[in-house]
Amino acid sequence: MKNLTIVADSNIASLDEFFNPVALGQNTEQQVQVIRVAGRDINAQLMADVQPDVLLIRSVTSINESLLSDNNSVKFVGSATIGTDHVDQEYLAERNITFANAAGCSKHSVAQYVVTAILTLRPQYWQQSTKPLTVGIIGLGNIGSTLAQYANDLGWKILGYDPLLATSDINNASLEQVLSQSDIVSLHVPLTDKKDTDAQDAVSNSISNNVSDYPTRHLINAETLTLMSPHTMLINSARGPVIDAAALEADIDATERQVVLDVFEHEPQISESLLSKLAIATPHIAGYTLEGKLRGTQIIYDALCEKLAVLPVLSMHQLLPLNTYLWFELKEHPDRLQKFYDIKKDDAALRNKITNGKVKGSDFDQLRRDYHLRREWQAQTISVTI
């Protein structure tokens, strides 16, 4: 067998532990070479020069024909992220390149981020009242449905909208109802464009198959924002362009709405004008827990082992230190929320990077790269395993 060459985003957790000859079941005479590269530096020239067998990425790297046209060796692409809007899966299928993404890897991390944001800004929502808080969830995949579990556990009412799923106890409302009847609206959708339109051609780094009958680009715009009460808090931890940033700024100016953004339309650059209007802003780290990161690596490691026809020999739980952050403890002692996750610290770190009216892309990426990973809150009633 030939040696195995892997090009990997250097920000993927525990690369050395998961991607070595022993963990990949390779014989001792075969080498596994892992070339670490910043995600935004994985380009067509690198792929042509190195000719790797395996490519491991995150959402900052777009996978398409322009990246791989001069590469003849890649047989496996793994994305250690939930989303897939950065990957042209149709092109990979045409090339017979196996693709795996880490579906659900950070669903608890992101759901806990949203709960933290809500209760940091409105601590009164810890208390049960005669009129329960209504949480509107747009997108009920892995993350949205997990957020619904936490909301239910806190006694909150749930209004959910996902046109791609069957009606259920949580998929129970129209988009208009969610926007107009909720105290909180939280977005958990992929980024998609309209079918049969040239719109995506005008968007840099767009993915050719990233289209839908229910497009989400600018789902939240000047028109849909008018459906929301000024009291309604808006949270986006999905994809930045789901919200029209210009319309959002105008809306906040008019309504003083509380808005929480972990993702931004023009990420990694953020304007000071937008940032100054937000109640909480963080640098795309909602899913950045130790468990979420390791789970993402575990999932693509398991998929690569399947591709190589070897049995996985490493579990993320072998790498995890003891976790003392317990969900039931937090519910009993809401005053410990800041100890569990101080979201304002992440907010301040981002705002401190403002120079000349903006946060530079390099500073945004640095905050993500050097982020001190949080721990997930462990729970008995809400599953936190893979």
UniProtKB/Swiss-Prot annotation:
Principal subcellular localization: cytoplasm
Keywords, alphabetical: Cytoplasm, NAD, Oxidoreductase, Pyridoxine biosynthesis
Pathway: Cofactor biosynthesis; pyridoxine 5'-phosphate biosynthesis; pyridoxine 5'-phosphate from D-erythrose 4-phosphate: step 2/5
Catalytic activity: 4-phospho-D-erythronate + NAD(+) = (R)-3-hydroxy-2-oxo-4-phosphooxybutanoate + NADH + H(+)
Signal peptide: none
Subunit composition and interactions: Homodimer.
Biological role: Catalyzes the oxidation of erythronate-4-phosphate to 3-hydroxy-2-oxo-4-phosphonooxybutanoate.
Name of the protein: Erythronate-4-phosphate dehydrogenase
